[in-house]
Amino acid sequence: MTSARRPAAPRQNVVLTASAMLAATFAISPAAAQTPNDDFARRQAQQAEQQRLETLGRMTPKPAQAEAQAPAAAGGKKTGPCFAITHIEVEGVGQFSAAAIDKVTAPYANRCVGVGEINALLRDLTHLYLDKGFVSSRVYVPAQDIAKTKVLRLVAVEGTLSDIYINGKPAPGSGVLATAFPGMKGEITNLRDIEQGLDQINRLSSNNAKTAMLPGKTDGTSILNVENKPEHPWHLSFGNSNLGQEQTGYSKSSASVGYDNLFGINDQWNFAYEHSGPDYPWRDDGLGKSNSYSGNVSVPYGYWTFSANGSWYEYDSSVPGNFGPLQTSGDSKQLGVGADRVIFRDKDSITTLNSGLTYKETNNFLLGNKIEVGSRKYTVGDLGISHSRRMLGGLWVFDLSYSQGLNLFDAVAPGDAGAGDADPRFSKFTGTITMTRPFELASQRLEINSIVTGQYSPDNLFGAEQFSLGGYSTVRGTRETMLYGNNGFFIRNDLVWRTQPFAGNAELAKMFGEFRPYVGLDYGRIASQARYRIDGGDMFGWTVGGKLAGGHVNFDIGYSDIFGGTVDRHDSGLLFVSTSVRW
């Protein structure tokens, strides 16, 4: 009993000594002082980036069918009588410069042209409009005496949009139409504007909208009809995987709820909860536990999409100490806003500007005492550009972004205890290229999925801002994140066999989707930086597995391992299982 009461003063010394040691670790090298807070922040950023690029890929226009008949060349075969023409006038043009029109008409001027060539000229001018997305515009030949004037007069009717219907009926007060197609009534009908608005409506998973053009009430006008029969607006998802880490438990369980069009303005709401811990009935499945809560909302307005997001994360774990394990804990929160703008789209591609502002706060504790070196507030501004394109038989997405630490919202200053040796006013560049290439082999549907991601910063970064390798989302083959640094890259490649074993049963196909066996090969490298005590290194990983995807039930099982590189590990490969059910 006496010995149980006496450790009060020694325990205080243990706390102070351990705190000093941990503080020194944080101060010396953020890369060596990674916490569950840092891992959660990186994972959140990776998931948000993946979701954004997947959404951009889905919005990229599908390949159009080839034209059945190409426009005739100006020098083609003459049919019937020809007319001597000195020049050509095109009236009613408001969307193109005189030089653009002259480029099309010049080959037909100062020559004798027949009816076939006049029709070819009409097609060329019409295609000029179609290539810009002006699908309801046309060019025709008015009554005239060409033989007398030697001038060919043409008239362009630049069709305008008089109204927008939903399911064949006017919808004057519709917030759905107001946010998807703002300012389009009375303007020239532009297919790109229609595609953009349709993408904004179908951004919500409950929608499956299609559009059709109806004749307007006056000449030269059209009505856009949006056909949509939304499914239930709410969405639920539950899942579990064994992809957690030792510090916070191997079991990761999640639940999420979403709601579409809550306020009738194409708004999308999502809330999620995730818990990790040693929750499996067997031993050796981690030490600590964690809980996270997150939410986001997005609202479109034509070519703009505005968003807000937030998250809260907390963990309890332990670290080795001289006298036994030491209890650690921490929490972090994040609040952000964003604005994306589609700046260009055509029949093959979309280009988007992305911007965001995020406030981040992190607290870490040892034996209940706050570790100042590992606790901080900081703010990051982001600006980027994304481009998706269908080319070379596949879908390509390119993304480049710049992040800057800002002196906003009580952000930690350089040299403060919370900053350690990291620079709170850091700058960093990140780039990503993804490629999805379907092909057939022996009548089987196969697909290659590749991603290359890299990061560069001239500064020393907080752990949450660093680049990491290891775990399921980067170089596969380990449960834990193995390498950290300010600069690095990784490459992931998957060969997927897309089978449809449930194609003969509509209900089973809806429930389970496709079965997709796959093999993967990954490589990543972290650059060494001696001045920041970052050793760097590289790692190779391989994966083999199979998944159910595309239905209400998603299931992924496989095995991955490291087969090369500089990482020092003592465990064997990872057998992983992940499952989720959504409605």
What is each PLM-predicted segment?
Residues Q268, W282-I385:
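Transmembrane beta-barrel wall of Gram-negative outer-membrane proteins
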Residues V257, G546-V553, D571-W583:
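Outer-membrane beta-barrel "beta-signal"
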Residues G220, G249-S253, K289-Y293, D331-L335, ...:
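Residues that define the transmembrane beta-barrel architecture of outer-membrane proteins
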Residues M213, F238-N242, A255, W269-H275, ...:
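Transmembrane beta-barrel strands of outer-membrane/channel proteins
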Residues N363-F515, L521-Y523, A527:
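C-terminal outer-membrane beta-barrel translocator/porin domains of Gram-negative envelope proteins
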Residues S241-L243, S276-R283, G321-L326, F365-V373, ...:
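Extracellular loop and loop/strand-boundary signature of outer-membrane beta-barrel proteins
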Residues W234-L236, F263-W269, G302-A308, D346-T351, ...:
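Repeated loop/turn-to-beta-strand initiation elements of outer-membrane beta-barrel proteins
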Residues S3-A4, Q34-G244, S256, E274-N291, ...:
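Periplasmic polypeptide-binding modules associated with outer-membrane biogenesis and secretion
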